[in-house]
């Protein structure tokens, strides 16, 4: 194999240079795309009046919108903000939500940090590999042979680098579920013997196209255990790749900004790329976030290309040599057709997946809906880039219950109409109490309030100087214009099914506090932030459609012995160390589960559980660790099973097919393969509690 030289030094968060290059195109080592001069949270805090002082004075607070002309009162008043975070999702004068005070916590013995080349689970738990990269799932697909790979074979096999996972019920087939998986990116160094990154072959590129995308696989559970395995050639099984057909829908579909020489309609797209996390909808579909799509394109020429991190020269992967659509000098709009949330109906293998333009275009990490009291979906989303933004979408349509054809057809339109918002956060502590070290302010919490700034509703833009189509296609620029708060890489965003609170994983930001970059603020309280934090957000009056919210930091990650860490006030002597929170999920008891990406503490990545309410709130426990070089992705927490995607095992600088850094999952002498793993309790009881 020819070395990838020159290698950039290891990622400041702990990830290898090999991972950085193939997953996100070395985004952390390039100039931050957000160079807008909108206010940083620190600037806002410097002028903010302490909310506690205002409340003590019984004054009325008005919060200006980005344009400075409108004010939010009523639900955005301090009383609503305080009530939103008081107790557990309570409303003024109303009881807490059922079961919120009866949290059970997590009662397993935590796994110690380690560097073992295996999946390590707690005592009393068992595991199995559900499916590996390359296993056949479609009729006619051959068994995997790393030395006989073809694009045709890969298009019928489980894809590479599994990320987001979802398990959906399958009526009428006992013990079976439908598993949907993202395949975020390929690492050809670990896929092909003798791979030359400067001169990939057409065959290698076409195999990589087929290894991207999504997989739908029916899985069967083994009687009396938690084991899962694929049902090969099931009629619902499906592969979607970088060359499959997708349809643009919503208010920007058909826009001139989405048209190319191959698609004069602006509605038909080939492929989905860099699908990271996602979500499962209440109406039985799955959502998939297109994240670091910029790395696949060459020769960016416009300011919009630059704002999305697209380079001005050849791409790392060299795909433009084999398909002109990846050369923006020839097809300047092709990149605009990526960076969306994809909706897939896993129960209809003949359906065309849809890219939902109403949810905006940016580096989507995930998209997890919740329903309002009247049945409208609200989707929370993070843009995974340093100093980028937090968003939500509120649908104007109500979900129809049931599984009739009419209900399903209607529900497949829910994410095409509504209002797209971006968040602006304000801290409530004096600016001199936020010093960049992570030291808590005098009130004992990093907290504050915020507003949701509307960007567009249908074909109406709320951003001066931008049309609605421009808002949807260039959503980052819209956020810049209205002064959204720049965050530390907002990734997965999930609402709790028990309390309604929303949890935002902010993975890290090594640039915070550097010369010419914004320093610490109350929502992002550490300079050179290696370990990240988790923000807890409560919509005013528990209303997901509210234009205001209260927030506080639930966790400030790192070594518990570090005074700059915080675990919701729980004694730090009793918690596990954690670094770089990425994906989050909930169990039925309201416990939050966190997977990590790029452990800067030196041990392997893992999955962690933590109670979000009750007496054990903040008690973080490590549930598992993954093998050498791997990332923990896509956690699914069922009552009696945990599912995780073990992504890029063995992805260590200098590793290759010939010189593997890991022997997982099949032992020495076998090629390293990203895989899905199931974990269960040996006694058959509920996970964790």
Predicted regions located by residue number:
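N-terminal export signals
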Residues: 47, 53-76
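Beta-propeller blade signature
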Residues: 212-219, 337-346, 393-394, 530-540, ...
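Extended catalytic-interface subdomain
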Residues: 135, 342-343, 386-480
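Signature of short aromatic-glycine-proline-rich micro-motifs recurring in repeat-based ectodomains
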Residues: 153-167, 264-277, 481-492, 570-585, ...
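Long, well-ordered hydrophobic secondary-structure segments characteristic of membrane-embedded
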Residues: 103-282, 287-294, 304, 310-345, ...
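Blade-edge beta-strand/turn elements of extracellular beta-propeller
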Residues: 116-132, 140-153, 224-266, 344-361, ...
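Blade-level signature of beta-propeller repeat domains, shared across WD40, Kelch, NHL, RCC1
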Residues: 639-689
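N-terminal secretory signal peptides
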Residues: 1-49
């Amino acid at each position: 194999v020819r070395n990838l030289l020159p290698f950039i030094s290891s990622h400041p968060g702990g990830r290898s240079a090999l991972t950085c290059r193939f997953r996100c195109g070395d985004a952390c080592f390039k100039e931050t795309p957000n160079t807008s001069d909108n206010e940083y949270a620190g600037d806002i805090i410097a002028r903010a009046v302490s909310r506690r002082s205002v409340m003590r004075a019984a004054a009325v607070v008005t919060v200006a919108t980005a344009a400075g002309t409108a004010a939010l009162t009523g639900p955005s008043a301090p009383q609503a903000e305080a009530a939103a975070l008081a107790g557990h999702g309570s409303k003024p004068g109303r009881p807490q939500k059922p079961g919120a005070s009866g949290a059970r916590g997590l009662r397993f013995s935590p796994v110690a940090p380690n560097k073992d080349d295996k999946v390590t689970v707690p005592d009393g738990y068992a595991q199995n590999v559900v499916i590996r990269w390359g296993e056949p799932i479609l009729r006619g697909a051959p068994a995997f042979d790393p030395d006989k790979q073809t694009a045709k074979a890969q298009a019928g096999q489980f894809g590479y680098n599994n990320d987001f996972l979802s398990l959906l019920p399958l009526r009428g087939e006992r013990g079976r579920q439908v598993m949907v998986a993202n395949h975020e990116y390929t690492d050809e160094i670990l896929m092909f013997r003798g791979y030359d990154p400067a001169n990939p072959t057409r065959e290698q590129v076409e195999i990589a196209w087929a290894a991207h995308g999504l997989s739908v696989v029916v899985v069967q559970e083994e009687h009396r255990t938690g084991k899962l395995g694929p049902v090969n050639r099931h009629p619902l099984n499906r592969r979607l790749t970088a060359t499959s057909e997708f349809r643009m829908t919503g208010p920007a579909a058909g826009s001139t900004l989405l048209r190319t020489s191959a698609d004069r309609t602006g509605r038909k797209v080939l492929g989905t790329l860099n699908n990271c996390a996602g979500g499962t909808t209440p109406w039985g579909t799955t959502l998939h976030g297109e994240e670091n799509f910029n790395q696949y394109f060459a020769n960016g020429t416009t300011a919009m290309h630059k704002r999305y991190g697209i380079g001005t020269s050849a791409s790392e992967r060299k795909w433009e040599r084999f398909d002109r659509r990846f050369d923006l000098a020839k097809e300047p709009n092709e990149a605009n057709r990526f960076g969306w949330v994809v909706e897939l109906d896993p129960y209809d293998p003949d359906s065309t997946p849809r890219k939902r333009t109403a949810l905006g275009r940016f580096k989507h990490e995930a998209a997890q809906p919740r329903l309002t009291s009247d049945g409208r979906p609200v989707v929370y989303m993070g843009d995974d880039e340093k100093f980028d933004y937090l968003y939500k979408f509120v649908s104007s349509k109500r979900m129809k219950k049931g599984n009739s054809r009419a209900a399903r057809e209607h529900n497949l339109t829910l994410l095409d109409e509504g209002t797209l918002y971006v968040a602006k956060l304000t801290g409530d502590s004096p600016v001199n109490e936020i010093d960049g070290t992570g030291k808590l302010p005098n009130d004992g919490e990093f907290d504050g309030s915020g507003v949701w700034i509307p960007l567009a509703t249908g074909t109406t833009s709320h951003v001066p100087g931008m049309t609605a189509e421009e808002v949807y296609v260039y959503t980052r620029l819209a956020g810049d214009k209205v002064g959204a708060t720049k965050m530390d890489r907002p990734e997965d965003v999930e609402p709790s099914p028990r309390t309604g609170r929303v949890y935002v994983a902010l993975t890290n930001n090594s640039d915070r506090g550097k010369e010419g970059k914004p320093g610490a603020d109350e929502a992002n309280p550490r300079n050179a932030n290696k370990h990240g934090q988790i923000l807890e957000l409560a919509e005013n009056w528990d209303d997901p459609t509210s234009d205001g919210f209260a927030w506080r930091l639930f966790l400030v990650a790192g070594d518990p012995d570090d005074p700059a860490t915080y675990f919701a006030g729980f004694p730090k002597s009793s918690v596990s160390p954690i670094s770089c929170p990425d994906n989050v999920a909930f169990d039925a008891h309201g416990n939050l589960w966190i997977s990590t990406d790029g452990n800067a503490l030196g041990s392997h990545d893992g999955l962690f559980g933590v109670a979000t309410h009750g007496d054990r709130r903040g008690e973080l426990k490590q549930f598992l660790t993954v093998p050498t070089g791997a990332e923990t992705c896509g956690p699914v927490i069922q009552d009696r099973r945990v599912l995780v995607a073990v992504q890029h095992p063995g992805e260590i600088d200098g590793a290759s097919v010939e010189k593997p850094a890991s022997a997982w999952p099949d032992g020495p002498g076998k090629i390293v393969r990203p895989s899905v793993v199931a974990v269960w309790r040996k006694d058959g009881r509920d996970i964790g509690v």
